């Protein structure tokens, strides 16, 4: 069974019995409104018993009626923007859709929770050439809970959905006229959310920061990056660009915060979670590192004059990249379906629900967080000084890689503290990020040289010239030397005394 995806950009409005839709011709190039008739829709929404999908702004439904009958999974992207992943109509939840929310459900059953019967009156908003700009629909909705309780609700709402590739100015112009006519932006992001609210069966609200203690700020940071990790999970399963990188970054930030803020959270509880985050980051790194290295080497080859690309260089790199990518992606997807990974997600939830706070957590953030940031900074300074004192070679490469890791932890610690400490923490994070970038480029060169050597050996063994591979190796060697020279300058900027005044 296959699934396809559609990016949905729409706005919802609340209306009433005495409100009439305004004339829309002339707004943002709308030349005509075409009546497309009324369609009867029957949608059953699925969720866990504790409404985990609804709490995350996700909806999963089985709908009949209309032109797109089938299963629809809607994943939030941004305000007014969702990705709708579709699967053919069938009785049970399609496995491709269930897989996309596995990080949310973690084995909990997806069962019917709400049924919505809608009469949809559709109008197409067209330009002078008859091109569809947007679709406006007036939905008269009847909602019924399916958990055995008598909850029911009825309402009417208006939706305006932008046509594929359309201009957001159309939505803005239509909204201006709708609001002038008395319509108001809907309080609920989806029909399911409205149905749950009107029947008293609301999803659990997201916890918000309620104070300015060290514990408040650290937990707020952790909560944001657990959310980022879960959002990236679905993106990785869909093989979206940069998704593995985003998931890996969320994993690193969480692990770094747990280690940097041990004065706030009891390490007896957080160290095991940090170890599991380290495991996950390592597994994700196989896929991400392959992706980064392929892009780097491809760019190097593309920049060479054709006269210096001797032999089947591009073909050999393509075969190497395809084989590595296939294996890496399969391994990543397998990891996301393991009990170990799902147990890690449970552990993160437990950490946020019942945090192991230490006495320092109750103190003002401005007193506790600077110490943690400066401790990470001191570790970074020691590692940079050690690396710069070593002669060029493998030992220095390893020391620079260790300094890179310390730079990440310092940057993440400063970013976590920035909401409480303001500009000084943000400034330190920016300067350390520059150091991290130089060290990251250096490490990428170290990895690239090892791969280029292997590719050269294989090319030679196959009777091909290794000239181009050697040339690329030399370029990477020169690049690493340049990054080492550059490090002194960026480190001087990041080690200015005023930056340590948090």
Protein language model features and the residues they cover:
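Cationic, histidine-enriched alpha-helical/coil surfaces that engage anionic ligands
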Residues: 1-502
């Amino acid at each position: 069974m296959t699934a396809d995806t559609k990016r949905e950009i729409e706005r919802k409005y609340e209306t009433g019995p005495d409100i009439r839709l305004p004339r829309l011709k002339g707004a943002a190039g709308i030349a005509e409104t075409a009546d497309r008739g009324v369609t009867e829709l029957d949608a059953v929404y699925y969720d866990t018993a504790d409404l985990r999908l609804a709490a995350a702004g996700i909806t999963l439904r089985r709908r009949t009626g209309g032109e797109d009958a089938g299963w629809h999974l809607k994943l939030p992207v941004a305000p007014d923007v969702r990705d709708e992943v579709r699967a053919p109509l069938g009785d049970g939840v399609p496995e491709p859709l269930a897989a996309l929310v596995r990080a949310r459900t973690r084995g909990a059953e997806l069962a019917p929770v709400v049924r919505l019967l809608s009469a949809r009156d559709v109008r197409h908003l067209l330009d002078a050439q008859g091109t569809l700009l947007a679709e406006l629909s007036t939905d008269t909705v009847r909602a019924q809970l399916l958990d055995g309780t008598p909850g029911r609700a009825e309402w009417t709402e208006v939706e305006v959905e932008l046509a594929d590739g359309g201009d957001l100015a159309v939505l803005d112009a239509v909204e201006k006229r709708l609001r002038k006519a008395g319509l108001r932006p809907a309080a609920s992001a989806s029909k399911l959310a409205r149905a749950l609210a009107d029947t008293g069966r609301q999803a659990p609200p997201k916890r918000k920061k309620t104070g300015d203690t060290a514990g408040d700020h650290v937990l707020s940071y952790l909560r944001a990056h657990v959310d980022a990790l879960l959002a990236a999970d679905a993106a990785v399963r869909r093989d979206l660009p940069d998704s593995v990188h985003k998931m890996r970054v969320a994993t690193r930030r969480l692990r770094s915060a747990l280690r940097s803020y041990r004065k706030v959270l009891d390490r007896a509880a957080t160290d095991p979670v940090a170890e599991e985050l380290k495991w996950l980051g390592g597994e994700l790194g196989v896929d991400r590192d392959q992706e980064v290295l392929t892009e780097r080497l491809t760019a190097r080859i593309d920049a060479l004059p054709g006269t210096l690309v001797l032999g089947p260089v591009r073909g050999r790199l393509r075969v190497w990249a395809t084989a590595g990518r296939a294996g890496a992606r399969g391994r990543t997807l397998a990891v996301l379906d393991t009990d170990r990974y799902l147990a890690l997600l449970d552990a993160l939830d437990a950490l946020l629900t019942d945090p192991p706070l230490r006495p320092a957590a109750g103190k003002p953030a401005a007193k506790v967080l600077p110490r943690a940031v400066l401790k990470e900074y001191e570790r970074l300074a020691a590692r940079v000084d050690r690396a710069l004192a070593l002669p060029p070679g493998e030992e220095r490469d390893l020391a620079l890689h260790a300094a890179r890791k310390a730079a990440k932890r310092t940057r993440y610690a400063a970013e976590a503290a920035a909401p409480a400490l303001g500009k000084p923490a943000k400034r330190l994070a920016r300067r350390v990020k520059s150091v991290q970038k130089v060290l990251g480029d250096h490490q990428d060169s170290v990895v690239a040289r090892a791969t280029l050597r292997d590719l050269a050996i294989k090319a030679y063994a196959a009777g091909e010239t290794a000239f181009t591979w050697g040339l690329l190796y030399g370029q990477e060697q020169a690049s690493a030397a340049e990054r080492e020279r550059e490090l002194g300058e960026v480190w001087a900027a990041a080690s200015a005394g005023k930056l340590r005044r948090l």
